[in-house]
């Protein structure tokens, strides 16, 4: 049974890759700037009145995020947390001109909610939901690649935050500090570890993107790296990967090429979770599985190191290593 699931997952990944090649990659790449949220970003919550949606919408508002409303077809026309409730995301967009949506919709309906947001041309869609069927996300992935209006972060992710300005997700806001380090991660809890360390070292964060641990993320490492490399406020980058797939190896190749073309390369520090995971066993996330001898932590470490990335063998040293790398630039 497990072998069948592993084979299916591998096949889906291959199908997705070939499908993406057929579509126009340049279209979806145009949405990368949509990730740069700020204090003016207006946010709609899909699944607004549910327990999780309510809790995290309130926390976002407390942080200063401009939450302008939410959706619930059964409660359209009412208010919740002092904000309007709309029947559809299309109606919400017409009334609020929102810049982003946060998806707190149960797994069976979440892909549909994402597709509705794409149809409504929401610039940034942040899908927090875990457990969305992979066939559904494969369909969403193909839809994303055919358009240039909406950018997806997630699913199964902690979200995205620009410290001191805007929070869309479930991350603990108090550990963040405005600063100069861009953080991108497949792991939620390890994201918080990197955030806390860069706060403690007084570097702070320019933008933190939790891309999620599912096999078909709306935003990958390379998307985030492109944003960070072009962002003048980002001086260093922390990349946290996991076993499984080839996202980290792809990122390594991109970093190698990008830094070769820059007069002053931006330092990158990386940690890969799951180094002790046995072959063929899924570790936590749906995408964290070593299959067919590929996707091992060792292979990822090797690829990243060859690209000039500073490797952290423990998550506890991410903060100190990025400080060391930044100090090297001063000498």
UniProtKB/Swiss-Prot annotation:
Assigned keywords, A-Z: Ligase, Mitochondrion, Nucleotide-binding, Transit peptide, Tricarboxylic acid cycle
UniProt cross-references to SUPFAM superfamilies, sorted A to Z: NAD(P)-binding Rossmann-fold domains, Succinyl-CoA synthetase domains
Transit peptide: 1-22
UniProt key word Mitochondrion: yes
Keyword Nuclease among record annotations: no
Pathway it works in: Carbohydrate metabolism; tricarboxylic acid cycle; succinate from succinyl-CoA (ligase route): step 1/1
Residue positions binding CoA: 49-52, 75, 128-130
Transmembrane segments: none
Enzyme active site: 285 (tele-phosphohistidine intermediate)
Cellular compartments annotated: Mitochondrion
GO molecular function: nucleotide binding; succinate-CoA ligase (ADP-forming) activity; succinate-CoA ligase (GDP-forming) activity
Binding, substrate: 192
Gene3D superfamilies according to UniProt: NAD(P)-binding Rossmann-like Domain (3.40.50.720), Succinyl-CoA synthetase domains (3.40.50.261)
BP GO annotations: succinyl-CoA metabolic process; tricarboxylic acid cycle
UniProt catalytic activity: succinate + ATP + CoA = succinyl-CoA + ADP + phosphate
Annotated InterPro entries: Cit_synth/succinyl-CoA_lig_AS, Citrt_syn/SCS-alpha_CS, CoA-bd, CoA_lig_alpha, NAD(P)-bd_dom_sf, SUCC_ACL_C, Succinyl-CoA_synth-like
Cited NCBIfam families: PRK05678.1, sucCoAalpha
Subunit structure and binding partners: Heterodimer of an alpha and a beta subunit.
The family this protein is said to belong to: Belongs to the succinate/malate CoA ligase alpha subunit family.
Annotated protein name in UniProt: Succinate--CoA ligase [ADP-forming] subunit alpha, mitochondrial
Organism in which the protein naturally occurs: Schizosaccharomyces pombe (strain 972 / ATCC 24843)
Taxonomy of the source species: Eukaryota, Fungi, Dikarya, Ascomycota, Taphrinomycotina
């Amino acid at each position: 049974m497990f072998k069948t699931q592993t084979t299916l997952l591998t096949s889906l990944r291959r199908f997705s890759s070939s499908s993406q090649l057929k579509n126009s990659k340049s279209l979806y790449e145009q949405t990368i700037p949509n990730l740069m949220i700020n204090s003016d970003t207006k946010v709609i919550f899909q699944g607004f009145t549910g327990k999780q949606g309510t809790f995290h919408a309130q926390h976002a508002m407390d942080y200063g995020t401009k939450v302008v409303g939410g959706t619930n077809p059964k409660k359209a026309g009412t208010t919740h947390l002092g904000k309007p409730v709309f029947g559809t995301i299309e109606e919400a967009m017409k009334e609020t001109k929102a810049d982003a949506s946060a998806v707190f919709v149960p797994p069976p309906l979440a892909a549909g909610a994402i597709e509705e947001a794409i149809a409504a041309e929401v610039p940034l869609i942040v899908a927090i939901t875990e457990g969305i069927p992979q066939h559904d996300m494969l369909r969403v992935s193909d839809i994303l690649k055919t358009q240039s209006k909406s950018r997806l972060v997630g699913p199964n992710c902690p979200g995205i935050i620009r410290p001191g300005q805007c929070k869309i997700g479930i991350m603990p806001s108090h550990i963040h500090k405005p600063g100069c380090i861009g953080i991108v991660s497949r792991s939620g809890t390890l994201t918080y570890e990197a955030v806390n360390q860069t706060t403690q070292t007084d570097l702070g964060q320019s933008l933190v993107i939790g891309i999620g641990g599912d096999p078909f993320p709306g935003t990958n490492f390379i998307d985030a790296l492109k944003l960070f490399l072009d962002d003048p406020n980002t001086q260093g980058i922390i990349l946290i990967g996991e076993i499984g797939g080839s996202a980290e190896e792809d990122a390594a190749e991109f970093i190698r090429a990008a830094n070769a073309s820059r007069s002053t390369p931006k330092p990158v520090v990386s940690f890969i979770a799951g180094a002790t995971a046995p072959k063929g066993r899924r570790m936590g996330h749906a995408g964290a599985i070593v299959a067919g001898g590929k996707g091992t932590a060792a292979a990822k470490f090797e690829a990243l190191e060859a690209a000039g990335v500073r490797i952290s063998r423990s998550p506890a040293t991410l903060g100190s290593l990025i400080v060391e790398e930044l100090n090297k630039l001063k000498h």
